[in-house]
Structures are given as structure tokens and as C-alpha cells.
Amino acid sequence: MKTLLLSLVVVTIVCLDLGYTLTCLICPEKYCNKVHTCLNGEKICFKKYDQRKLLGKRYIRGCADTCPVRKPREIVECCSTDKCNH
């Protein structure tokens, strides 16, 4: 019985994902569904876009270790849950 219990504990530990990796969206379109697994240490999803009236909005999405710095005429949104940068 102890052997069975020990085997179940070992299988459970091996099958569990003990680490957590953030996933963020990464496409340049307004509506996005391409998912990217962030690197270790990247704990932020971001979405940047600028307000160019003639050319429309240009989107940049991805993972980062900190929220990117905003440039003039640019909007930056940051979040920290999976696929939150929609």
C-alpha cells in the first residue's frame, strides 16, 4: 500500500506544471488571437498603439519584464494575466 501511495505522489509531482509561464497576444492588428509564451522573467503583457489620424492605429503587443515607456502620441496598456493585452 505504501508503494502504491508513493508511486501516486511521484506521478502527481511529475505531471504537475510547477512553474507558471505568462502568455500574451503578439499580433499587430486591432483584433488579435496569436498567443506567445513569455520568457522566464517576463511578467507583463503590453499593448502599444499610436494615434496617427491618416494611417490609422498601429498596434504592438508582447511580453516584457516591465511596462514599456510611453512615447509622444502613444498609448501603452500593461497587464499581468494570460492574454490580457487584447
Curated annotation (Swiss-Prot):
One of its GO terms (molecular function) is acetylcholine receptor inhibitor activity. Expressed by the venom gland. It is found in: Secreted. Keywords: Acetylcholine receptor inhibiting toxin, Disulfide bond, Ion channel impairing toxin, Neurotoxin, Postsynaptic neurotoxin, Secreted, Signal, Toxin. SUPFAM superfamilies: Snake toxin-like. Disulfide bonds join C24-C45, C27-C32, C38-C63, C67-C78, C79-C84. GO terms for cellular component: extracellular region. The keyword Signal applies. Residues 1-21 form the signal peptide. Gene3D superfamilies: CD59. It holds the Pfam family Toxin_cobra-type. Binds with low affinity to muscular (alpha-1-beta-1-delta-epsilon/CHRNA1-CHRNB1-CHRND-CHRNE) and very low affinity to neuronal (alpha-7/CHRNA7) nicotinic acetylcholine receptor (nAChR). Belongs to the three-finger toxin family. Ancestral subfamily. Orphan group II sub-subfamily. This is Probable weak neurotoxin NNAM1. It comes from Naja atra.
